[in-house]
Amino acid sequence: MSETIFFIVPYPFGEAPSQRFRFEQYLTFLEENGFKIEIHPFLNESTWKTLYREGNVGKKIIGITGSFYRRFLLLFQLRRANHIFIHREAAQLGPPIFEWIIAKVLRRKYIYDFDDAIWLPNYSETNARFQRLKSYWKVNYCMKWAEKITAGNAYLANYALQYNPTVQIIPTTIDTIHHHNRKCDQSTKKPTIGWTGTHTTMHYLDEIVPIIRDLENHFSFDFLIISNEPPSFELASLKFIKWTKETEIEDLAKITIGIMPLKQDIWSEGKCGFKGLQYMALE
């Protein structure tokens, strides 16, 4: 009889890079080896698309309420799970109620996985009013109650060791055999400087925009952004491609020079360099 793994995750399947490359790309392998997989996201696709946009407060409240209701129902389904894997947090708002119930009430063991310094406040201006509801401190308890922790890099692992002695570093990986294996044409006379990421991380480009604008006065190039939402700024060199899973590699191959701007701060210490891995994986 096959064993069932419950993946309790924040985002819809196939939407968030952290999920896609930390475990979703391995699900087929697990299924081929006899495991049954169930993905249980906190946000459904509708709420995910609405949450990080301006306005739509009513839709956001309804969507989040529905998310908590689904999490409540999930507690009654956990008896079917042989293994429980929690990525980042069971719910994106509020204290670690669900993790506490799973560990202390239901007495279930779980693996806790994270790939960012998510104990630190980090939020978009769009949802600044809701940031107090995030309860960033809950990450410490999620770590403390976990049976095992998997962290994306040494900085994150060292932090986790304060709360749990069973920590394993598992870097975010790139599949260069089946996925990131396209050869790029670098013979073009007009180079393309490129960035890829979700709209929630686009604020990292704020300090780059003046530099790009200055370069436009001296060189001919395209500045390509690949994201699920277009940027709010304008540039003469700007090109935008809406991210899709189907064309992701083809679009990345258009980039001559990939950039991954970061600030020198504690939050950036927790980054796992995934954009850099994506750029360098393509020949």
What is the predicted role of each segment?
Residues 91, 203, 245-281:
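Nucleotide-sugar-dependent
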Residues 42-73, 87-88, 93:
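A short, charged, and often flexible helix/loop element on the N-terminal side
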Residues 155, 173:
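Carbohydrate-associated surface elements
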Residues 2-15, 42, 194-195:
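Nucleotide-activated donor-dependent transferases that construct or modify glycoconjugates
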Residues 68-80, 94-107, 112-113, 118-120, ...:
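Membrane-proximal helix-turn-helix segments that form the acceptor-binding/catalytic region
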Residues 11, 20, 84-107, 113, ...:
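An aromatic- and histidine-rich active-site surface loop
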Residues 14-29, 38-39, 175-181, 185-254:
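Conserved catalytic-core segment of nucleotide-activated headgroup transferases in glycan assembly
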Residues 43-58, 110-140, 168, 175, ...:
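Acceptor-binding helix/loop patch of EC 2.4 sugar-transfer enzymes
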